[in-house]
């Protein structure tokens, strides 16, 4: 005796799963596009604001943060890296810019200035940074130039890299490895000393 089983319900289920995956993919692509456009628009707006403040603003005597939280811009010409720096390291900030790490000095102050950004967006070019590369940091106080003295990989809880220094030092922090999928297990550290 032969039993016939209809494949119609299985086919409908598989088609439904297929459409579900397509909808999820479209949603993820849409979200990614929104995040990229939002970051681009934020950076354009803040770059214009920085240029306007630099043009119309008398140089303050103390380190300054604009009312919007804008601190300045980092440029590493050899790497083609240019990113706005704002105060804080919340998820929203790091989605749109590099963030000044609270508790570290501001540019222009003595000590270890800490700046962080995501490895898969703004700090992706750091994978190619080399000793003696020049980092330019433009702020409301003026322009600072730093020379890279070292890079290293540390654990995510190693805050010693941000400890104070008697000199003017810049520390860039991003997740590592650069091509890791998911939450990266380590941090990539770039240490630079001020030269002008």
Which ranges hold each PLM region?
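Solvent-exposed, non-transmembrane regions of membrane-associated and secreted proteins
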Residues: 9-196
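Terminal targeting segments of Actinobacterial cell-envelope proteins
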Residues: 1-11
């Amino acid at each position: 005796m032969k039993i016939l089983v209809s494949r119609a319900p299985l086919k409908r289920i598989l088609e439904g799963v297929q459409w579900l995956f397509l909808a999820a993919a479209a949603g993820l692509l849409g979200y990614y596009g929104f995040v990229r456009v939002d970051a681009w628009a934020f950076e354009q707006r803040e770059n214009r604001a920085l240029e306007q403040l630099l043009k119309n603003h008398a140089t303050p005597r103390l380190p300054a943060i604009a009312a919007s939280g804008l601190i300045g811009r980092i440029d590493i010409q050899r790497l083609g890296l240019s990113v706005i720096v704002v105060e804080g390291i919340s998820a929203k900030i790091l989605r749109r810019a590099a963030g000044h790490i609270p508790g570290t000095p501001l540019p222009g102050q003595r000590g270890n200035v800490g700046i962080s950004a995501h490895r898969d967006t703004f700090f992706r070019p750091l994978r190619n940074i080399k000793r003696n590369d020049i980092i330019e940091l433009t702020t409301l106080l003026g322009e600072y130039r730093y020379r890279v003295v070292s890079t290293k990989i540390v654990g995510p809880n190693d805050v010693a890299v941000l400890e104070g220094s008697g000199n003017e030092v810049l520390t860039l922090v991003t997740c590592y490895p650069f091509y890791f999928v998911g939450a990266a297990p380590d941090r990539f550290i770039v240490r630079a000393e001020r030269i002008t």
